[in-house]
Each structure stands twice: as C-alpha cells, then as structure tokens.
Amino acid sequence: MSEEVSRNRVERKFWSPSVTSQFCVCPIPFHFDTYRGCTYGCLFCFARDLTEFARRNKDENHKRQSYLEGNDPKGLLKWIEKTMASAYDYSKAEVVAFKERIPVKIGATADPFPIIEKWEHITYDCLKIFDKLDYPVQISTKNPEVFLSYAKDFVGSNIALNVSCSFCDDDIARQIECGAISPSRRFAAIKELSKLGFKITVRIQPFILPYSEKVADRFIKTLSECGAWDFETEGLKMRVTSSLKERLIYKKMSEALGYNVLAYFKKRGIIEGGDRVYSAEDKRSMLSTYTYLAKKYGLKFFNADNLIDSRYGCGCECCGTEFLRNHKIWGGSKRALAFKDSGAISSEEFGKCLVNFTRNTNKHNLTIAQVSRMYKVNRK
C-alpha cells in the first residue's frame, strides 16, 4: 500500500469565502480558509480561541484547535460559478467582494499549508481554481516549504505570499512557535521562492518588545539577504482579563525570551478595549526603527498595527497585495483613508453591501460605507 493511501484522510466540507468584521480598518476584509484548525501551536495565536469557541457552539465535541478539517475545492468551484453567473446582491457582501475582485486572503485563521497538505492538496486545488480566473490571492503561512514543493505550478500566478515569522532565533521560536518549522528553514524557503519570482512578504506579527527591538537590524538584514520583497509588523496584544491557561502561556513565552512579558506590559503598556497593548510612544519608536531598516536594506515596509499613520509604511495594503493584477480594495477603511495617494482602486460597490454578517445585529440594516463612516467619526 502506498504511503498516500495508508494515511488517514482529513474530513472535508465546504465553507464559502466571507467578509470579516474588520472592514472599518482593513482595506481587504475578504478571507477564505482552506483548512480549519492548526497544528503549529503558536503560544500567541489569536485564532485558537475563536476556533475552539465556534466548535463548542456547534456541538462538535469541543474539538481543539489542533483538530484539522479540510475545505472542499469542488464546493468552491460551484460557489464561484454561481457567484459569477449572479447579479450584484448587496445582502451578500462575499458575493460582491468576489465580483469586485477584492483579493481573497487564504490563511487568515488557519494555516493553508499543514503537513497533510502534502498529500491532501486541498490548498493546491483551490489555488488552481483561483488561478484559472487570474483571481488575486494573498496567502499567509508559517510553512512555505509545503508551497515550495509545488510552487513551480504557480509561477506567474496572481499570488501574494506572506510568510509569518516573529523571531530570527531558532531556539526561541522552537519554544513559542512550537509546531512550526524553524525560522532558518523559513528563510531558506523564502530564498528559493524568490528565485522563482514570487514576491514574499514576511509578517512580523506580532513584534514583542523589547526582544524585537534588540534583534531588528539582524532580522531585517536576514530578510533582505534571503530575497524577501517586504515585511509587515504589528505589536503583541494580551487580554486584560486572562484565564489560568493564558497566564501559563505568558509564563512560557517569558521563559523563552528571558524576561517577564506580562510585567513589561504592566509597566510600559496601556489598556485599549479589553487588551493590553504597547504605548503609542513605544509603538512609534519601533515603527520608526522598522522604517529606517527597510530603507537601509532595500525592502518595502508595511505597518499592520492599529496605530495607523502614513509616516509608517509604504501604503494601505499591509499584507503585500499592491502588485496583484486587476484588483480593488475597500477605500472607506481607516487604513486606506490614511494612504489616499497609494494608487489603489476602491470598490464603491462593496461599500453598498449590508453589514448582516457580524454578531452586532444593530448594524444589520446599515451598509459597509455607513458603518465605516460611523467608525471614523467615533475614533476622532
């Protein structure tokens, strides 16, 4: 029996692309996961609680984040065919987003390249479907080696590939990004992918102070040497009210980094909503450092932090999608408005969609454009 046949096959079911509630801030709030769940076990993962909460609510036997489910490429093809044949329906934001060619983000809440992708080829099959339409796609992963294994099939495709890597030290990463391949292996894969012509964005999300500041020069120099096109950053957040499980996670992170991460937040951070975040002063200092290093090493730099300021970063498309062919963004988002001269084309049709896809039912009869304007006024 072949190795492929002997392996257990992942459970498959179709879920369609969807618009996220981040449209007030993000110019590309459109995502599609090829898998659900993740085996990489990063201690700072924001998607873990979202996934496990959703599974508890659906009575799925409290399946943990590490339990993988696969999407159905055949279902995706049917959805696309139906969407392309339909008229604009502003009660279905995901349909309008697709028809307007807003880039679809693959890997927003689940890595599209788990080890099983080597034989399941779910992400591969989905990418082939998008590729036939030359549809703009942004991919986020911690395992570019899997994509590298079949990357030659996508040379010249309308793809922006993001590789997530918050650390440049293998020993530290091994303790915090527990199941992911080492940074050195990621850098090696980036080098090979860049040789094939892929423009690679490295996501330093999150940056963790003061560690990230100390290694910044060495880190960005390494990215330049391995052929990355750009990098993007966002500061770490911690919930103010944390469970015992979360406190143990912070303890593990502290042990790996050699200082008390939570104590640093309490001393130098601020509370924003329900999260502890770095102060504006510390963020600006870090963003200024990254801006300088990007120029020093010939890279583009994008700021993905909620501290949005046109002085930091090369534009509003912080996930490195600006070079994608024939795409639009949501120009009414805060980030897009901060970079009005970026040259990006805004989708006015997307702004007409009803916000009936969020848990806040008070806004279900309002449009994306209306809610975005309200957000802008309330944040002044």
Walk through the language-model features, giving the residues of each.
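Auxiliary Fe-S-binding modules of radical SAM enzymes
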Residues: 2-5, 214-380
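Conserved Radical SAM active-site core
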Residues: 3-162, 170-171, 380
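Conserved non-cysteine loop/helix-boundary elements of the Radical SAM core domain that shape
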Residues: 64-68, 113-121, 171-191, 208-218
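Generic structural signal for well-ordered alpha-helices
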Residues: 77-84, 124-127, 151, 186-191, ...
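Conserved radical SAM core fold
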Residues: 103-114, 144-148, 161-180, 207-209, ...
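Hydrophobic faces of well-ordered beta-strands that scaffold small-molecule active sites
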Residues: 104-106, 137-139, 161-163, 200-204, ...
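Anion (oxyanion) recognition and catalysis
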Residues: 131, 155, 194-195, 224, ...
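Conserved strand-turn element in the central/C-terminal portion of the radical SAM core barrel
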Residues: 179, 192-213, 272-280
